Structure formats: C-alpha cells, structure tokens
Curated annotation (Swiss-Prot):
Belongs to the DegT/DnrJ/EryC1 family. ArnB subfamily. This is UDP-4-amino-4-deoxy-L-arabinose--oxoglutarate aminotransferase. Keywords: Aminotransferase, Antibiotic resistance, Lipid A biosynthesis, Lipid biosynthesis, Lipid metabolism, Lipopolysaccharide biosynthesis, Pyridoxal phosphate, Transferase. The modification N6-(pyridoxal phosphate)lysine is found at K182. It comes from Escherichia coli O7:K1 (strain IAI39 / ExPEC). CDD domains: AHBA_syn (cd00616).
Length: 379
C-alpha cells in the first residue's frame, strides 16, 4: 500500500527551525518582540488597527466575550455548523448560544437567519467564514449596527481570505487561528484584530492575569516591576517561540495558499464528472483561502454513505475530516435544545467530508484521492 496520505499536515521547513533557534538563543522565549512583530504584521495584513496574539482562537473567543460583558441571561447567535469551542465559551460564561441554520450549499450563516433569531437578550453575533470563504460580512455587520449588537467574526479558517477586495478582519473584530491544520500554524495559537481601542486594551489585560502590562512591556519601557491587577484575567499569552513560527509561516502565506488553490482546482475539475457535491462558492467578490475542500456524500445520489466512503478511503490509505458535526446534535447541547430543527445544517452534517488538502500535497497525491473517489462512486 502507498504511504498514508493524511487529511492535513503542517508545511514546516528550515525557516521555521531557524526562527525557533533564534528565539531560543535570544534569551527571551515567552511573550516578547516576536509577539509584537506578529501583531504588527496582522495589522498590516488586515488593515485593522489593533492585534492581540493569544494562545489559541478559543482563548481569543473567551476573552472577547468576557470583554463584551456577555454573561447570564444574554444570548449569542452562532451557526450550529461550527467547532464547538465557540458554543462552549458562550455557555461557560452563563450565556445561551442561539444556533441558527446555514445556507444549504455554501454552509455560510445568512443575514436572514441571524436577523430572525434576534431577541431583546441578544448580545453578540458570531458568523463563521467557513472553509476559507467569506460570509456576507457587510450585510451581517449592518444588522449588528442596526440593532446595536456586537459582531465577532470567527476567522479561524480565513487567513488569506478576502471579501470585496479587503482581507477578512479589515474592520470590526475578528479572531484567527494558528492551529496545526490551519493555513498558517505555530502548533497552537490565535490572534484577535479589532478597531475598538477600549476593547483591545481590555483584551490585553484579560489575556495576561488582568495586568495592565506584561513582563516584556515592563522591561522594554522601564515601567514599575510591581504590575497591578486591574481585573481578574487569564494566562492566554502566546510565547515568542510560537510567534516566531507564525511569523515565518505568514511570510509564506501567498505561496501556501496558492498551492492550496491549485489542489482545490484539481479536485473541482475531477468532481464535475462525479456524484460527490462540492460546496458552492459565495456569490459576492472574494478570494478563497481554501482551508478545507469539502464534498457532500448523499447515499442516494452517490451509491455510498459518507461514513462508508470515509472508511473506504482510510482502507486505501487516505485520510479525511469532518467539519463539522452540528453542535446541536452533541449530547450537551442536544439535551438543552431537544426540539431545535436546522434542516440545512442537519442535511450537510450527515454528508460532509473534508478531503486531503495541504500545501505539501503533490499533484500525484490529489490524483490518488480522485482515483479512489472514481472507484467508489456508485458502489
């Protein structure tokens, strides 16, 4: 059998090793100059005013919700078709996640679904830029402005995604992920961008014990060594080891995403003759980052179920992913929302399958996946 082809693999090279070596030899390995450089680089990439690096996108979501004073009695609108960390953070703060449906073919949450879910208790809206494509963020942001509700963009899939000529996160507040399977990675990490100066100040405190300054800030600016707690906070800072890797990856972003796009185009061309249905692309002008390439496997149409297809691909040495099982079908949320019905979400959650897609894949790797799909179609 051929070597196992994973669903994803980080694209690491000698540059990342050199970046880590530089940090280790510098004597400053925790939050410091590399964090500052990463934050500045993301302000430049997105065009936004403030950037706050954190230990994960989940941490970023947690402190953003906290900074917006979301808590007991509040509601936060989010698609169910998302990673459960968003709903977990909402729930842990005592608020209620209000899960809404998505468009059947793009899997994007729609402005109409969001607006129909708004109540007097709605405190925030969290749209997801799904799989590397952008949601209709202008329309969603307009709803937030009309009702006076905060919009927090889940941009975990969207490093390199553009909407109407502007990078995701160009305005408002957005949260990016540097997890191992993301378009750029530092193993674990995340970053928040915002144009709200007061929010940025609160996020910096909340990510580091509630202190007004961190250790590097005190050393660099000669501020008093006895930092004062201004509010209870967390330990969500990113180390400079991680930040150095993320910076190195960011310098490669165009190359990495170009390769992802090439593989996606190879899949798209082949799938035109197969019963497996890829996602539709959004109608608005955009640049797709191709974080994921997803097909829908409808048993009646394809002659094989999604789960059977994934198992058959595994037997052929090909890995796959599932992004995502609908959150409202998970035990904790199912018990709390037993009557919730989201038809488009449920239909897709039972059929979606993420194919291998990462920059170090070869054309032959993609051909191998395509050949397997051709063999399995109609079985």
């Amino acid at each position: 059998m051929s070597e196992f082809l994973p669903f994803s693999r980080p694209a690491m090279g000698v540059e990342e090793l050199a970046a880590v070596k530089e940090v280790l030899e510098s004597g400053w390995i925790t939050t410091g100059p590399k964090n500052q450089a990463l934050e500045q680089a993301f302000c430049q990439l997105t065009g936004n005013q403030h950037a706050i690096a954190v230990s994960s996108a989940t941490a970023g979501m947690h402190i953003t919700l906290m900074a917006l004073e979301i808590g007991k009695g509040d509601e936060v609108i989010t698609p169910s078709l998302t990673w459960v960390s968003t709903l977990n953070m909402i729930s842990l703060l005592g608020a209620t996640p209000v899960m809404v449906d998505v468009d059947r073919d793009t899997l994007m949450v729609t402005p109409e679904a969001i607006e129909s879910a708004i109540t007097p208790r709605t405190k925030a809206i969290i749209p997801v830029h799904y799989a590397g494509a952008p949601a209709d963020i202008d329309a969603i942001r307009a709803i937030g402005e009309r009702y006076g509700i905060a919009v927090i963009e889940d941009a975990a899939h969207a490093v390199g995604t553009y909407y109407k000529g502007r990078h995701i996160g160009a305005k408002g507040t957005a949260i990016f992920s540097f997890h191992a399977i993301k378009n750029i990675t530092c193993a674990e990490g995340g970053l928040i961008v915002t144009d709200n100066e007061n929010l940025a100040r609160q996020l910096r405190m909340l990510k580091f014990h509630g202190l007004g300054v961190d250790a590097y800030d005190r050393q660099t600016w000669g501020r008093a060594p006895q930092a004062e707690v201004l509010t209870p906070g967390y330990k969500y800072n990113l180390t400079d080891i991680n930040a150095a890797i993320a910076l190195t990856q960011l310098a490669k972003l165009e190359h990495l995403n170009t390769r992802r796009r090439e593989i996606a185009q190879q899949y798209q061309q082949a799938l035109a003759a197969l019963p497996f249905q890829p996602l539709s692309l959004p109608a608005w002008p955009h640049v797709h980052a191709w974080h994921l390439f997803i097909i829908r496997v409808d048993e009646q149409r394809c002659g094989i179920s999604r789960d059977a297809l994934m198992e058959a691909l595994k037997e052929r040495g090909i890995g796959t992913g599932l992004h995502f099982r609908a959150a409202h079908t998970q035990k904790y949320y199912r018990e709390r929302c037993p009557t919730l019905s989201l038809p488009n979400t449920e239909w897709n959650s039972e059929r979606i399958c993420s194919l291998p897609l990462f920059p170090d894949m070869t054309t032959a790797d993609a051909d191998r996946v395509i050949t397997a799909l051709q063999q399995l179609a109609g079985q």
